[in-house]
A protein has these predicted regions:
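Conserved RecA-like helicase ATPase core segment
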Residues: 74-167
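A basic/glycine-biased coupling hinge at the interface between accessory DNA-binding modules
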Residues: 1-61, 88, 108, 164
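Glutamine-centric residue-chemistry signal
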Residues: 25-28, 70, 76, 98
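Hydrophobic beta-strand segment of the Class I
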Residues: 64
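Residue-level detector of secondary-structure boundary/capping sites
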Residues: 12-16, 34, 71, 105, ...
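Walker B catalytic acidic pair
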Residues: 60, 68, 95
């Protein structure tokens, strides 16, 4: 298994932050505490062993639903893959324009490559935003077009809004 600090720190932590994070990991281990990322890692390790108990557990999951798929990290992806069987049905929701957890190791490529990785995938793109009007949707769409890795899409709001946006 990958060193926890290396796996979770993402690409943006400097040496000072890495030192502090290592102290945090040491504290957890000394006190026999388990945080959420460690729970995921332990689940991945158990799933890889394929013990009879794990096999029975996995057989109970026929449908897997994942929200905010654009924000999963490598450990979470490994856990998801470990839960899948040939009979599994997986339904994910993700928005490549809203990937915000790169600082903690999330990887947008898992969403962008989803259709290549999982057979029989069908994508539905929701193009009408019922939360915001055309003014905000237009501005955010122009901004999102500058993102390096994203699906091409066109959005519209469900109502006309007058005004102006100032930065």
């Amino acid at each position: 298994m990958m060193n926890r600090v290396e796996e979770e720190k993402g690409n943006e932590l400097g040496e000072g932050h890495t030192f502090i994070y290592q102290k945090y990991i040491d504290y957890l281990e000394e006190n026999k505490f388990v945080d959420y990322p460690r729970m995921v890692q332990l689940a991945v390790a158990a799933l890889r062993k394929k013990s009879p108990a794990v096999t029975v557990l996995i057989s109970r999951f026929h449908h897997i639903l994942i929200d905010e798929y654009q924000d999963i990290n490598l450990s979470q992806k490994q856990m998801i893959d470990g839960l899948l069987t040939k009979q599994s049905n997986m339904w994910v929701v993700g928005d490549d324009d809203q990937a915000i957890y790169g600082w903690r190791g999330s990887d947008i490529s898992f969403l962008l490559n989803f259709e290549r990785e999982y057979a029989f995938t069908e994508r539905f793109t929701l193009t009408i935003n019922y939360r915001s009007g055309d003014l905000i949707i237009g501005a955010s769409s122009r901004l999102a077009k500058n993102l390096q890795s994203r699906f091409e899409k066109n959005f519209s709001g469900d109502r006309q809004v007058k005004g102006e946006i100032r930065f």
